[in-house]
Amino acid sequence: MHKSFYHYLMKYREETPRDEIAAFANEAFADHSFPKGADEYDTLSRYLEMDVDYLPSMSVFDTAWEKYEQDELMV
């Protein structure tokens, strides 16, 4: 069984983020409405596009999603 995207993303959290994915992980951690159990691209991208303002660009999510697919979903 694979981790949800949120739980996968948490491995990138850093007190002082070194990159955009670490900053994204920190913001997602602080976002109490983040869909923590979601593992579908459409659900997550819709939430991020419509409900948050902490991502500088959706390309940050796309990069994190590609890593998630490779590591967890083995696509």
Model-predicted regions and their roles:
Residues 1-24:
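N-terminal acidic leader/helix
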Residues 1-2, 35-39:
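Short acidic alpha-helix initiation/capping motifs at coil-to-helix transition points
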Residues 12-13, 28-32, 47-51, 64-68:
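Generic structural signal for hydrophobic core residues of well-folded globular domains
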Residues 14-18, 34, 54:
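Alpha-helix boundary/capping and short turn/kink residues
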Residues 20-37:
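A short, compositionally biased N-terminal segment around positions ~18-40 that is enriched
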Residues 71-75:
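Short acidic DE-rich linear segments
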